[in-house]
Structure formats: C-alpha cells, structure tokens
C-alpha cells in the first residue's frame, strides 16, 4: 500500500520504482533488511487510520507557539523504516536530547515507524509523508518565519536514485524524493531550515533542498552508502557521531557535523569500510539565525543514549526479576528504557558484498 498521496501522473513509475527499492533493501546493508513486519489488518488501501490521526492531532495540538523576541527552534524527527530499531532509537533520542539539553520542550514532534508503535495505543504518530507534510504545516503556522528555525532529522534507508524509504508495515511502503521534501517545507512556509538526513546516498538531496536559508547535513555523499543500520546496531554511524556524541559536546549543529565527519572517517578507515563522505551545505542567511538561537540558549547537561549496545543487551527470551532493580524499566517500551551509565558505539554490522540502501 502506498502512503504517499501527492503522486500525480508519476504514480505508476513510483510503484515500479518501489518494487526495485524493496528488492534492493532485501539484498542491502544487513540480513534483516526488508524483514516481514506486522500487518495492520484494519488499514485498507488509502484508508485513514483513525488511531494514527488521533496521535498526530494530539502531537500537533501540544505544540507551543513561538515567543516574540526569542529565536525558537522547532524539531521534527522522522524514523522511516519500521524494520530497523536504530531509526526509532535515534528519533526518540532526538526528542530527549532537544527537550532536555536544548530547551525545546513543547516544540518537538517525532514520527516513528516501528512494530512497537502499531496498535491502539501508539506513543507517536507514524512516519508517513502525509504526517510529515501536516506536521510541517502546523509548525509553519506557529513559528515566526523571520525569527525562528526548524530542525528536521530524518533517519531511514536511502536509495541510489536519491529517495528516502518509508515502511510502516508489510502493506504500507513508500519513498520520498528530494522534490517531495522541498515541496512540504515550501508549502509550510518555513523559512530557516536545518535539515539532517541520516541515510545512504543522502547527499543527493542537497541540490533540491539548498537555499540561502538552509543548512543541510547528510550522512553520505550522493554516490556513497552510509553504515550502521540493521538489527546488530543500536545507532547508525552518523547518528552515533553527530546526534549522540557531537551534539552532546556542542550546541552548534555545524560544528558538531565537523566533529562527526572526523569521527566517521576514522571509524570507517579502522573498519575497512568504503568512505561515506558526509556532506554539508550552508546557506548564507541561516548562519545568523543559528547564532541568535545559540546566544539565547543555555545548553543543559549531556543526555545519555538510552539504548544499550546489542552485544550487552538482555537476551530476548531471558526472564528478568523486576524486583532485582526497582529502577529498571522494560525494554519493550522504547520511551522508558533505562539509561545506561556510558553508552558505547554500536557493533559493526555483518559485512555484505554491496551495501546499497541502509
């Protein structure tokens, strides 16, 4: 089932391309890519999911208005592929980090695809193009175009032809092009933009998204994969380096990117990976907005990453005594994971002949 409504005359082409994407993912960055996911039996073709729409309405109604004279940062996280927990992990951590360290509480929306976010009591709206479009539109109505800024963080698989892969469950799949993303941002009337894309080949989004009011940070060059997706990792290489490590050391997204690029280069060299070559594009008008935001910000303490490395995580079938540690919480609820004392780097995923779409 396609989630993406504004197909226009290219609907058939999108469907055919989607089949190619799915095949590529199944042969791509990790052995679990494209694994079967739960089927939402109640959701028919092109039907609106009332549970998801209620979750979206609740999230958007909770958004706080902008404050005159203050450069407010609105934050949107998008975990696109439900088959990999790393995308959910990073997106929920994005909320924790920006609410606690960067004083963005009331101005953060997370859209998440994961099997644990399906059902009658989701903890976040689903990560679909329509939900992203509506979220950006709602933020555009609340923010001051000349004063405030948006940070959009997307973490998912990317394709060689420069699309972002979206999978809610086995019947709901889509992909988002650079033009789709630009249209959603432009239609929302959002001025100052910080766009962070953690996906393979994400540098291919830069030409369509570039503007004087935009900072773009990508995990890879247009012709390169990035690494760390899969169910053997708790974070992608880029998510670990930029979001988890560098943004806890700096309040400057661009300075954090420079730190992350250095760390990723060293890690890829050490592990023998093809360099992903993260990219950035800085518009001439976005830098003063970032400077104003940072000047009015008193950054809080570093926020620990709450998802333990998988090599030390409890076995799925292992029984645990809940009274052994009264402060521990079930890993089944990603919003209530016990924060480890010192989060470590994710384990390198199993090598594959040609990683194509992490």
Residue ranges and their predicted role:
Residues 71-74, 104-108, 145-150, 188-193, ...:
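Loop/turn elements at helix/coil->beta-strand transitions in domains of secreted/extracellular proteins
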Residues 199-284:
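Active-site-proximal C-terminal subdomain of hydrolase catalytic domains
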Residues 81-84, 113-118, 156-162, 170, ...:
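Solvent-exposed loop/turn segments at secondary-structure junctions
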Residues 12-15, 29-148, 233, 292-323, ...:
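Boundary/activation segment at the start of structured domains
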Residues 58, 89-93, 97, 127, ...:
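Extracytoplasmic/secreted proteins, especially bacterial periplasmic and envelope-associated proteins
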Residues 156-187:
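A short, glycine/acidic-enriched catalytic loop
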Residues 3-17:
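Bacterial N-terminal signal peptides that target proteins for export
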Residues 16-28:
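Bacterial N-terminal signal peptides
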């Amino acid at each position: 089932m396609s989630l993406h409504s504004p197909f226009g005359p290219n609907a058939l082409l999108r469907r055919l391309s989607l089949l190619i994407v799915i095949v590529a993912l199944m042969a791509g960055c990790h052995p679990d890519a494209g694994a079967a996911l739960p089927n939402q039996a109640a959701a028919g073709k092109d039907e609106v999911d009332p549970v998801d729409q209620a979750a979206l309405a609740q999230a958007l109604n909770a958004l706080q208005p902008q404050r005159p004279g203050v450069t407010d940062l609105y934050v949107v996280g998008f975990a696109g592929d439900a088959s990999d927990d790393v995308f959910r992990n990073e997106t929920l951590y994005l909320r924790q980090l920006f609410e606690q360290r960067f004083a963005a509480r009331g101005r953060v929306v997370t859209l998440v695809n994961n099997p644990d976010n399906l059902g009658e009591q989701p903890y976040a709206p689903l990560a679909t193009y329509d939900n992203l479009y509506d979220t950006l539109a709602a933020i555009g109505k609340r923010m001051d175009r000349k004063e405030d800024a948006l940070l959009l963080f997307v973490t998912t698989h990317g394709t060689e032809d420069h699309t972002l892969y979206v999978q809610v469950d086995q019947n709901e799949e889509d992909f988002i092009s650079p033009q789709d993303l630009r249209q959603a941002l432009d239609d929302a009337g959002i001025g100052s933009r910080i766009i962070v894309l953690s996906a393979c080949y994400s540098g291919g989004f830069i030409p369509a998204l570039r503007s004087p009011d935009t900072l773009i940070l990508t995990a890879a060059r247009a012709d390169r994969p990035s690494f760390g997706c899969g169910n053997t990792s708790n974070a992608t290489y880029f998510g670990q380096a930029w979001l988890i490590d560098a943004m806890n050391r700096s309040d400057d997204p661009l300075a954090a990117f420079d730190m992350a690029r250095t760390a990723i280069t060293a890690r890829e060299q050490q592990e023998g990976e093809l360099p992903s070559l993260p990219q950035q594009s800085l518009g001439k008008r976005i830098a003063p907005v970032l400077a104003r935001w940072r000047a009015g910000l008193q950054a809080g303490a570093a926020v620990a990453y709450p998802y333990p490395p998988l090599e030390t995580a409890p076995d799925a079938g292992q029984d645990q005594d809940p009274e052994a540690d009264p402060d521990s919480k079930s890993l089944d609820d990603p919003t209530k994971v016990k924060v480890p004392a010192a989060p470590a780097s994710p384990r390198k995923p199993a090598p594959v002949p040609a990683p194509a779409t992490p």
